[in-house]
Amino acid sequence: MAVTAAQVKELREKTGAGIMDAKRALVETDGNMEAAAELLREKGIAKAAKKADRVAAEGLTGIAVNGNVAAIVELNSETDFVAKNDQFVALVKETAELIASKKPATNEEALALETASGITLEAELVQATATIGEKITFRRFAVIEKTDAQHFGAYQHNGGKIGVVSVVEGADETLAKQVSMHIAAMNPTVLSADELDSEFVKAELAQMNHKIDEDNASRVLVNKPELPHHEFGSKSQLTEEVLAAAKASFEEELKAEGKPEKIWDKILPGKMAKFIVDNTKVDQQFALLAQLYIMDDSKTVEAFLESKGAKAIAFTRFEVGEGIEKAETDFAAEVEAAKAGL
């Protein structure tokens, strides 16, 4: 039977298939719309299966807020070009909204959710893989909840390559969003330095001091003074005994310099503050509250928020592709393989 343009248009709107794929499906099923849609679905699963072993490390984050619930998701594609595709962008948005609405606990639960199309999210991804032509995957999500007294800071950077949701108490959405902008830029991994494992701190401190050794090797060559090692890396290592010893050392310095004791109280706080800053570098790299705030680097994030009567409660930061090992493509080898008919 002859297939009309109206039938092709209807099937494309229903399935997202290309013009020729829709037309062929209608021809094969004698114009039966439901059968044609099922045929396209089956072909889509087959196409998706062929792409299953490909690495999808590009993509976008998506954020949706539904009252006191926010969701952040990451969907991946194989190329950045597809990540900018309107269908992919819409799929990311729909997925974030679905997660915020249904609050699944696991990826398995999320993939089983019914979408606006009446099919599961998993089926929607298979369909997208078939119609877009690249492997599309749902990698991860987080559901974040707050109270009425708290605010979400939702922020996406670089077109959605980085997504952040923060929860801030005692502030408005503007300040909460600024905190999320800081998180996007500075990439903290924990809220407070108290969350950093002691062995992790030791390992990071050793790496920092190794970097100082490398820098010092270069500085010696140009007759620059060597930089000192950091003795400590975290506030958790600055015990009362350590701080007392540092204070005593500074007092000895002031005494040796001939500074009268009556002015020591004006000098010591500054020296102690610098000692703490110099010996909490691991905290400053990984803990949000210990980092210098990018909007006012005279204060830590914690101190800045306190000055505004606010407090950071939690945050989640996704960066597209982090932790995914991308396949390295040797273009010359691909050309040679094509020539050889491999």
Curated annotation (Swiss-Prot):
InterPro entries: EF-Ts_dimer_sf (IPR036402), Transl_elong_EFTs/EF1B (IPR001816), Transl_elong_EFTs/EF1B_dimer (IPR014039), Transl_elong_Ts_CS (IPR018101), UBA-like_sf (IPR009060). SUPFAM superfamilies: Elongation factor Ts (EF-Ts), dimerisation domain, UBA-like. Gene3D superfamilies: 1.10.286.20, DNA helicase RuvA subunit, C-terminal domain, Elongation factor Ts, dimerisation domain. The keyword rRNA-binding does not apply. Its main location: cytoplasm. Keywords: Cytoplasm, Elongation factor, Protein biosynthesis. Residues 79-82 are annotated as: Involved in Mg(2+) ion dislocation from EF-Tu. It comes from the Bacteria. It is found in: Cytoplasm. One of its GO terms (molecular function) is mannan binding. It holds the Pfam family EF_TS. One of its GO terms (cellular component) is cytoplasm. PANTHER family: ELONGATION FACTOR TS, ELONGATION FACTOR TS, MITOCHONDRIAL. Belongs to the EF-Ts family. HAMAP family: EF_Ts. Associates with the EF-Tu.GDP complex and induces the exchange of GDP to GTP. It remains bound to the aminoacyl-tRNA.EF-Tu.GTP complex up to the GTP hydrolysis stage on the ribosome. This is Elongation factor Ts. It comes from Lactococcus lactis subsp. lactis (strain IL1403) (Streptococcus lactis).
